[in-house]
Every structure is written in C-alpha cells, then in structure tokens.
Curated annotation (Swiss-Prot):
Name of the encoding gene: thrS
Domain TGS per the UniProt entry, residue ranges: 1-61
Organism the protein comes from: Paraburkholderia phytofirmans (strain DSM 17436 / LMG 22146 / PsJN) (Burkholderia phytofirmans)
NCBIfam families: thrS
Cofactor: Zn(2+)
Free-text cofactor note: Binds 1 zinc ion per subunit.
Protein's name in the database: Threonine--tRNA ligase
Job of this protein: Catalyzes the attachment of threonine to tRNA(Thr) in a two-step reaction: L-threonine is first activated by ATP to form Thr-AMP and then transferred to the acceptor end of tRNA(Thr). Also edits incorrectly charged L-seryl-tRNA(Thr).
Native organism taxonomy: Bacteria, Pseudomonadati, Pseudomonadota, Betaproteobacteria, Burkholderiales
C-alpha cells in the first residue's frame, strides 16, 4: 500500500507503485491532461516518476512557477532537436533555463543568420505539433560517454566525462533526438505551444575565453500567448529606454574601445552624477557617517592579508614599481579597516561609520561589459560600520530605514528584500551564525518589512541582506547590500578596548545603497526613460526667445534663475521657436520658458512643462516657486 498526501491535506492510497501521471489521472482527467511534472517531498520530477513509498506529492501544471521552468527547459531541448534536424553538422553543448526564457549553445562552422532563426523556429513549431512523447532512461557514465562519442557529440561526451564514474546519467529523448539532462521535462512536445527565438550571441565553451567560441541562441517560452506578447512589449519598451541610446540622445556619456568598461561623462551626464552623489552625501552625513578617502593603489601584502589576492586575483588590475607589487583596489573595505586601525579605539568610539565614494576597478571580461550596467571602473557609495555585537541590530535597523527612504526618493517604491543565510563552507561557529542571522531578522522585523530567505546563499564570512529594486518595466535590480563580516576584522587586526579593558574584534558591516554609481545611473535613466524628475534633471529649465528683440530679456532671465540655483541655459539661436521647442522636448528638459514681445514688456514668461503641458503665462517669481515645489516634492 502506497499513501500519497496531496497539497490540500487529503491522502490517497494505492495498492501498488504508481507514477505521478497515474496519480493525476486518478484525481481527474483535467489534471491528467494539465500535468507537466510533480513534486515528491519537494523534489521536482517527471510525470513518469514512479512512487513506491509514502510521500507528499504536488502535481505541477502550467499555473505553477515550476511548470513554466519545465516548459522552458523542454523548449531548449526542442531548439537543439530542430537545429540538429536542420543542420546535422552542428554540435550541441548546454541549454539551461534563464530569466524569462532559455538558451542553447552550439558549435557550427558558420554563423547562424536571422533567416536561420526563422527556419529553426518554424521547425520547432512543426516538431511540437507532432506531440512526440518525451522519454527518460538512466545509464552509466561510461555508457553515456560511449553513446555521445558514437554520434559525434564531443562536447556532450566531455561534459559527461567530468562527472564521477559512479553517478548515473539521465538521458531524455523525443523523436530522433537524445540529450543529457537532469530534468524534469514535459511528458510530450505538444505541451510546448508558446515560444519565440530572440537572438544569436557569442559564447565560449565552459565560459572560458581560452576555449572554442560557440553560438548561443536565446529564446523565450510561456504558457499563454498573452504572457509572451506582454513580455515582447516590455522588451520593446526596454529598447526605447536603453540607457546607451538615451545616453547618446541626451548627450550624457559615451564609451570607447581605447578604454573598455570606463565611462566618459559629458557635462550633462556629470551634472546628473553630481546630483546623485551630493544627495547621497547629504543623507549619509545626516545619518552620522564620517566621509573618508582611501588610496586607489595599495601594496600586495595588504591584499594578501585581506584574502583578496588569493581569492580575487584574476579580477584585479595589478602593477609593479621599485620591485613591489601593487593592486588597484577592486573594493574599499581593506582601506577602511586601515583607517579604523590608525589609533587606539575604545568601545566609547563605537559605532564608527566610515563612508567613501570609492573609485574601484575590476578586470571584468570584455564580453561581460554592458554600457553603465557592467563596467571595469566604477564608484560605490560604500560605507563600513564598526560596532559592538550589542549595536549591530540597531545599526541594521538604521541602515534599512535609510536605504528604503533613498529608494523612494529616486522613484523606486517596489523593493524586494532577501536575506542570504549560512553556506556549508563558512567561518565561525554555529552559535555565532545563529546570533548574526537572528539579529538581521530582528532588524528587518522592527522595520516592518517582509523578506525572502535564501539558505546557503550567504558569504563564508557572514549573512547578508540584499535590496532588489523594481523599475518601471517590472525588472528587478539588486542595488543595496548589508553584509555582516566576522572575518576581515580578524584578518586585518581590527580591535577596540572593551569596557572591561579587554581587546575585542568589532563587528564589521559592509553596506551600500545604490551600489555602483554608474550602474545606478543606468537604472535611473531607464526607469525614468531619460525624463528625470526636476530635482535630478541635469538641465531643469531652458529659456527661449522667439526673436532677436527678446534675446536680452531671455538672457537676463536665465542669469537670474541661475543665481537662484536653477540649472538653466538660454537658447538664443536664430531658429524658429517650434524648432527650439522640439529640440529641447527631445532632450526631456522639465520646463521650457518662451519669451516674446508680450512677455518681455510684461516681464513674464510662457511656461511649458515636459509632455507639452501649457502652464500659461506667469511672472518669473511664480515660476520659481512652482519649480521649488516640484524639486522639493520628492521628499
């Protein structure tokens, strides 16, 4: 007798072992048709999985997140099947599920073209309509290696050869195609109805630039056509908002091959940067942080002591001078510990909060670079809090409150918080980790926020809180972090004199709110589609004259606004006013002031707000007051 407990708490009993598909069929024909897989005691399995002992079972359908993952994984295999069917010489490698879709890497003797993608997608649709059953078999490692070598799939054979000889290998087949996979997969290809191939990109075998270059075909797959259409529409919107395009259109920044991963900021872009930096400086100053500045280049010995040289060396830029090795800092924390160590610290000095807009450099691979979002040179709104164990909960509460307030000011109201917990390989005792994790939970609870816990995702030196902001398109970006560190203070000899005159290690909290300034500006540009709120806009106002006779008045008006702290310019060119308005509208300037003879004589201005909104004619002082209210409204 096999007893199976379902999610609603009911128990079904069977006289003999049954498959997930048979359980679904016994519940009802609708569920049998909808079943894509199952969850046996929390483990995702195929519908063909045999149940021979008492378990808890959930039937997975397209309504479940796991169901969508199964569909995407199976669609990746369908892609490989179609490619092999159309281009038998192509070799298959790997094809995982990613956010919103999947990809598959191929080795082929010529580049795939857009026409090839159309042909492949059409073939996928034909194969899906055949509704071929998907079967699984388990073989030994050596048998699997021999099979893939016999059909000329050297990459698959190489993957399997790296697996321990005692491990069983799962092979999935449908039609004339067999692939290595952990599964699970849909019961038949007919379940794959909504998908689209997106693009081809380059990739390296096993992600190593020293290996052969492959071709990566990206695709997306969904359970409903309307979901896919919504996703494709979001991509169109994202394309319009691409910070690289807007950076060029709005003359904010550029990047060039002579300095890969580094940003050339133009005047308006640097003005935007300064607004963000100055805002952040005000906030951390008000929160009791002390701003410091640490060297960009430091001796190898310091990086060895911190552990970065051993664990992060390949991502560090290094140099040599007078027979000494140096590294350009990839992060600011070791330098902050040096400031803390400079002098004897007492428990009365704590907490000490050091902030730095620290310039860091990391040797990211050129293929990973992406506009402002992934760079080699960046500035962090970095800070480190040195405190006692009794203080770290209150410091965590204060940081969370500050971070959430900052995100709101920048226009991000949807923030997801994640708590990364202890990994298997870690420093410190279980008791220490218990206190650290529970302390962060207490801090988040005190702030009245909800969070998701991620077991095993913490760093080896401590648990971490992550802040993921959602932009106008619903995309999630991790920006802020609060990382408890139980290792670096010991490695670098940080200590303070406790109340009982003993020497103790401080708790060290690494924290950032916006993270990389470059990346955050990229997110801001895309979130606001380049139309920054008035307080952030690099150019808040443009004053335009209709004819030469109003040029002097327009110029004096711009100068008056500038003296009052407004970021303004006067456009006195001998162009039609409609041309000027259109040009500055495309520049997404919040306010356009137009002056003609009537405005000059009455000492007024005609005001147009962004979006073509006519606010009418008003005295300059009235406009200034309106602008001030607009600027202050973000608070």
């Amino acid at each position: 007798m096999v007893s199976i407990r379902l999610p609603d708490g009911s128990v079904r009993q069977y006289e003999h072992p049954v498959t997930v598909a048979e359980v679904a069929a016994s519940i009802g024909p609708g569920l049998a048709k909808a079943a894509l897989g199952g969850k046996i005691d929390g483990e995702l399995v195929d519908t063909s999985a045999l149940i021979d002992h008492d378990v808890a079972l959930a039937i997975v359908t397209e309504k479940d997140a796991d169901g969508l993952d199964i569909i995407r994984h199976s669609t990746a295999h369908l892609l490989a099947y179609a490619v092999k069917d159309l281009y038998p010489e192509a070799q298959v490698t790997i094809g995982p599920v990613i956010d919103n879709g999947f990809y598959y890497d191929f080795a082929y003797n010529r580049p795939f073209t857009p026409e090839d993608l159309e042909k492949i997608e059409k073939r996928m649709q034909e194969l899906a309509k055949k509704d071929e059953p998907v079967s699984r078999r388990v073989v030994s490692r050596d048998e699997a290696v021999d099979y893939f070598k016999s059909i000329g799939e050297k990459y698959k054979a190489e993957i399997i050869e790296s697996i321990p000889a005692t491990d069983d290998i799962k092979l999935y087949s449908h039609g004339g195609f067999t692939d290595l996979c952990r599964g699970p997969h849909v019961p038949s290809t007919g379940k794959l109805k909504v998908f689209k191939l997106m693009k081809v990109a380059g990739a390296y075998w096993r992600g190593d630039s020293k290996n052969e270059q492959l071709q990566r075909i990206y695709g997306t797959a969904w359970t409903k056509k309307e979901d896919q259409e919504a996703y494709l529409h979001m991509l169109e919107e994202a394309e319009k908002r691409d910070h690289r395009k807007l950076g060029k259109q709005l003359d904010l920044f550029h990047m060039q091959d002579e300095s890969p991963g580094m940003v050339f900021w133009h005047p308006r872009g640097w003005t935007l940067w300064q607004q963000v930096e100055q805002y952040m400086r005000r906030r951390v100053n008000d929160a009791g942080y002390l701003e410091i500045k640490t060297p960009m280049i430091m001796d190898r010995s310091l990086w060895e002591a911190s552990g970065h040289w051993q664990n992060y060396r390949e991502n560090m830029f290094t140099t040599e001078s007078e027979k000494r090795d140096y590294a350009i800092k990839p992060m600011n924390c070791p330098g902050h510990v040096q400031v803390f160590n400079h002098g004897l610290r007492s428990y009365r000095d704590l907490p000490l909060r050091y902030a730095e807009f620290g310039s860091c450099h990391r040797n990211e691979s050129s293929g990973a670079l992406h506009g402002l979002m992934r760079v080699r040179g960046f500035v962090q709104d970095d800070a480190h809090i040195f405190c006692t164990e009794d203080q770290f909960i209150s410091e965590s509460i204060a940081f969370n409150t500050l971070a959430m307030s900052v995100y709101k000011d920048f226009g991000f109201d949807n923030v997801e918080i994640k708590l990364s917990l202890r990994p298997d390989a870690r420093a410190g005792t279980d008791e220490t980790w218990d206190r650290a994790e529970q302390g962060l939970r207490e801090a988040l609870t005190a702030c009245g926020v909800t969070w998701e816990e991620l077991p095993g995702e913490g760093a080896f030196y401590g648990p971490k809180v992550e802040y993921h902001i959602k932009d106008a398109l619903g995309r999630s970006w991790q920006c802020g972090t609060l990382q408890l560190d139980m290792v670096l203070p010991e490695r670098l000899g940080a200590e303070y004199v406790a109340e009982d005159n003993s020497r103790r290690r401080p708790i060290m909290l690494h924290r950032a709110i916006v993270g990389s300034m470059e990346r955050f500006l990229g997110i801001l540009i895309e979130h606001h589609a380049g139309a920054m709120p008035a307080w952030l806009a690099p150019m808040q106002v443009v004053v335009m004259n209709i004819a030469e006779s109003q040029a002097e008045y327009a110029q004096s008006l711009a100068q008056s606004l500038q003296k009052q702290g407004v970021r303004v310019e006067a456009d006195l060119r001998n162009e039609k006013i409609s041309y000027k308005i259109r040009e500055h509208t495309l520049e997404k300037v919040p306010y356009l002031l137009v002056v003609g003879d009537k405005e000059r004589e009455a000492q007024t201005v005609a005001v147009r707000a962004r979006g073509g909104v006519d606010l009418g004619v008003m005295p300059p002082d009235t406009f200034i007051e309106r602008l001030r209210q607009d600027v202050q409204s973000f608070n």
